[in-house]
Amino acid sequence: MSEVEEVLKEAYKLVTPTPEEERKVAEVGSRVRQWVSEALAGVAAEVDMYGSSARSTWLPGQRDIDIFVVLRDRSIKPEDVVQTLSRYFDGVGVPWSLRYAQHPYLSLYVEGYEVDVVPCYKIAPGERPITAADRSPLHHKFLSERLSEDQRRDVRLLKLFLKSIGVYGAEIKVEGFSGYLTELLVAYYGSFVDVLKAASGWRPYRTYISFTESKTKFKAPLVVVDPVDPNRNVAAAVSLTSMSTFVLASRRFLKKPSLSYFSPPEAPALGVNAVEVVFPYPGESPDVVWGRYKRLGKSLYKHLRECGFKIYRWGVESDEKTYVSIIYVVEDVELPPYVLHRGPPVYDNAIDAFVEKYLREEVVGPFVLGTRAYVIKRRRYTNIGDCIRAKLGGGYAIRINQYGGGLVRKTPWLT
């Protein structure tokens, strides 16, 4: 048995649900299907369970089930379906919450499981979907016909691998690999190991995966054409960083296999400088919040650099309940009061404006080094907190050198 096979033998144990878990998922899914069918009696619709819970590609401990209401009559609005279902579940005492994607859907809470009940329209292969959810029945059919039992096990293994390295999930928080994309990769390449072998050779903007002879053009680091919709790139959410992280992890696992790629150990925090800007969590959907604070983080990153602070890395973290924070790992949190500022070459027409500007200010210079003019001038901000406060309004807290999260730790899975 090879070293890779020995590690996978142990890793398979981590992704194999117990018979009790499988029984419970099937039981809860069947019960909710019956409830929904009863609530929508007389409506031209098919009610079924799709997604990973229906294909046995879910990870142990996962508490999510997807039930779809596939509407055959396009005059029926998803909003009306949701309203009918909400009244029914109020009547039988099942707790629920209203969620939104392109249209509303319900999340039920049944015996510790979160069951999403999603209306969609019935479409034929190749037909343009009305909503993104309309593709789900076709996705289920495509994968159910192609994935063997061993491949379904390998899908679970690949999901855990991606989750452990931090790139599992297509939501804005992660910008990584969706569950559907993970299943397509195993279906396309054949096995977990074959996916990693192929990914080791992927190159951004030059990797194009299609089950057909599709010639549709996409501009993205990774392209995986949806086999049921050739105009859609299933990998559109995968960022350059997430793709590159997966390529590195694939190469290193094949070179030096370890269970750490499936169960990362705890890594100690190092004493590097870090500043954390902490905001109260707003009452909005996670995708909206993550998108907003990633944009704010990028803007603040540029501002900090303009202030003279060297940023090693940065990121956004949140518990999606009480706080969202932007963290910057920096070289220094305090800068010296003066900085060398480079001007134009003395042979450039802009030199006169540079000299006249700094003759009116308190500086050292202007002086010439080589062909350029320079001055030594006072910084506007020397403290990183002052620089941040100049950019932002109120409603946040600044914590300096109190952060101990993943951005200041050794990568725990890498071997």
Swiss-Prot record:
Keywords per UniProt: ATP-binding, Magnesium, Metal-binding, Nucleotide-binding, Nucleotidyltransferase, RNA repair, RNA-binding, Transferase, tRNA processing
GO molecular function, one term: magnesium ion binding
Gene Ontology BP, a term: RNA repair
Taxonomy, superkingdom: Archaea
InterPro entries, alphabetized: CAA_C (IPR048833), CCA-adding_arc (IPR008229), CCA_tRNA_nucleotrans_2 (IPR042090), NT_2-5OAS_ClassI-CCAase (IPR006116), NT_sf (IPR043519), NuclTrfase_I-like_C (IPR011068), Polymerase_NTP_transf_dom (IPR002934), tRNA_NucTransf2 (IPR015329)
Pfam families per UniProt: CAA_C, NTP_transf_2, tRNA_NucTransf2
Necessary cofactors: Mg(2+)
EC number: 2.7.7.72
Catalytic activity: a tRNA precursor + 2 CTP + ATP = a tRNA with a 3' CCA end + 3 diphosphate; a tRNA with a 3' CCA end + 2 CTP + ATP = a tRNA with a 3' CCACCA end + 3 diphosphate
Annotated residues for binding of CTP: 52, 55, 139, 159, 168
Top enzyme category: transferase
Chain residues that bind Mg(2+): 64, 66, 116
Annotated positions binding ATP: 52, 55, 139, 159, 168
Note in the entry: A single active site specifically recognizes both ATP and CTP and is responsible for their addition.
NCBIfam families named among the record's database cross-references: cca_archaeal (TIGR03671)
Function noted in UniProt: Catalyzes the addition and repair of the essential 3'-terminal CCA sequence in tRNAs without using a nucleic acid template. Adds these three nucleotides in the order of C, C, and A to the tRNA nucleotide-73, using CTP and ATP as substrates and producing inorganic pyrophosphate. tRNA 3'-terminal CCA addition is required both for tRNA processing and repair. Also involved in tRNA surveillance by mediating tandem CCA addition to generate a CCACCA at the 3' terminus of unstable tRNAs. While stable tRNAs receive only 3'-terminal CCA, unstable tRNAs are marked with CCACCA and rapidly degraded.
HAMAP family attached to this UniProt entry: CCA_arch
Family affiliation: Belongs to the tRNA nucleotidyltransferase/poly(A) polymerase family. Archaeal CCA-adding enzyme subfamily.
Binding partners and assembly: Homodimer.
Protein name per UniProt: CCA-adding enzyme
Organism: Pyrobaculum neutrophilum (strain DSM 2338 / JCM 9278 / NBRC 100436 / V24Sta)
Lineage of the species this protein comes from: Archaea, Thermoproteota, Thermoprotei, Thermoproteales, Thermoproteaceae
